[in-house]
Amino acid sequence: MTVTIENIHAREIFDSRGNPTVEVDVRLTDGTLGRAAVPSGASTGDREAVELRDGGARLQGKGVSKAVANVNGEIYEALKGQSPFNQAKLDHLMIELDGTENKSCLGANAILGVSMAIFRAAANSEKIPLYRYFGGVDLELPQPFFNVINGGVHADSGIDVQEFLITPVKRDSFRDGLKKIANIYHTLKKILSDKGLKTPVGDEGGFAPKLGTTENAIAILYQPIDSAGYFPGEKIAIAIDSSSIEFYDDKKKFYRFEGKNLTSKELLTYYDNLVEKYPALISIEDGFSEHDWEGFAAQTKARGQKIQLVGDDIFVTNPTIFKEGIKKNVANAILIKLNQIGTVTETIETISLARKAGYKTMISHRSGETVDSYIADFSVAMHAGQIKSGSMARSERVEKYNQLLRIEEDLGKDVALAQFPG
C-alpha cells in the first residue's frame, strides 16, 4: 500500500514565554501521526524568515490564527495525497506556494510546523526513531553548551551580553557531561546566594543575577568550575553569546556597551583582552552586529585560528546569506535555528554548506520554546557537533538534553562523541 498524506491539522498552542505558537499534526493513510511545535525567538535577525502573527487586540497581537488557517487551508490542499517520504519536494512546494523570499505570505511558522511534522510522520511510518530517519546509522552525539547566566533581552539582569554558557570539554559520555554541568549549575546557585545575589532564572533557565559586567559574569563562572575540580578550560570551558545587535547603534555605527560607546575596533580589543585574561573562554557568538560585517570579518581574521566565532543573526541559517559570509571569511562557525529559515530542507542545505566550507555547526533552541525535542534528534543525525538548549532548569530546555540521554542509551556505549576543541 502506498502511504500518502491524509490530513494536516494545525492549532494554536503556547510557548515557554506564554506567547502563541503553531503546532501541526500530519496524519498519513496508514494511520501514522507526526506532530511538531514551532519555537520563537526574542532576539531575532532582521533577515530571518517571517513569523506570521495576527496583530490586533487578541493576545496582544501575537496570535497565530492566520498561520493556523494557512496550514489547514492552502498548505493542506497542496500537500494532501503526496508521499511523505520526499521531504525536499514537499518543502519546495510550500516555498512556491508562499511565493516570497522570507515566507511572509503563509508564514515561516506555518511552513516549518508542517515541514517538521512530515519528517516525524515519515519516521513513525517507517517505525524508526527520528534521528535514524534523518541520519541513518553513522551518528554522533553533540557537545552541549548550557546557558547558566542569562543577560540581554533574555533576562532583567542588567548585563549587556545575552548568554554565558559552559560546556563539558572532557566527558566519558553525554550523561557524564550532563552530570558535570548539573553539579556546576547547583554550585553556582549556592555561590551566588552566598554573595547575597538573587537567583531568578531567565527565559532560557540560566540565573539572572545583577552582576553588572560581562567580565564579572565570566569571573564568577570560574568559581564553581574550580570548586568541582573540573579546571576551567580543561574539563569545562566557557562560551558567550553577545547578541550584539541588541546594543549596536545602526545609525551612529557604534556599540553602546557597558556604559560606553565603542567602535568596532574598540569592541574587538575588548574581546581580545577578555580571551587573554580568561583562557577558558573558547567561543564567542555574534560578537558583532549583523549590520557590521567588517567588524565580524576583522575578528575572524584576528582570532579565528584561536577561538570559535559563531555567526547567528548575521547568517540566520539562510544558505544564500551564508554563502556570502563564507566568501568574506566571516566567522568560523554557524548557529543553526530551524525557524530562521523555515523548512527542514533549507536547514540541511545550510549545514551541508558549513561542512564543505570547514565551519563548525551548533544547533540551537529559541528563547520561546516548547517541550518538542526535535532539535535533539536533528543534532545527532546531522553530525552538528554542538547543541545549545538553555540551562538545567525549565522543562522545555531540559527535555532536549533528556532526549539526547535516551538517544545515547539507544545507540549504546560505543557511540561517537563530538569534541570541541579537538
Swiss-Prot record:
PROSITE patterns: ENOLASE
SUPFAM superfamilies: Enolase C-terminal domain-like, Enolase N-terminal domain-like
GO molecular function, one term: phosphopyruvate hydratase activity
EC number assigned by the record: 4.2.1.11
Keyword list, A-Z: Cytoplasm, Glycolysis, Lyase, Magnesium, Metal-binding, Plasmid, Secreted
Pathway: Carbohydrate degradation; glycolysis; pyruvate from D-glyceraldehyde 3-phosphate: step 4/5
GO annotation, biological process: glycolytic process
A single cellular component GO annotation: phosphopyruvate hydratase complex
UniProt-listed PANTHER family: ENOLASE
UniProt family annotation: Belongs to the enolase family.
Protein name from the UniProt record: Enolase
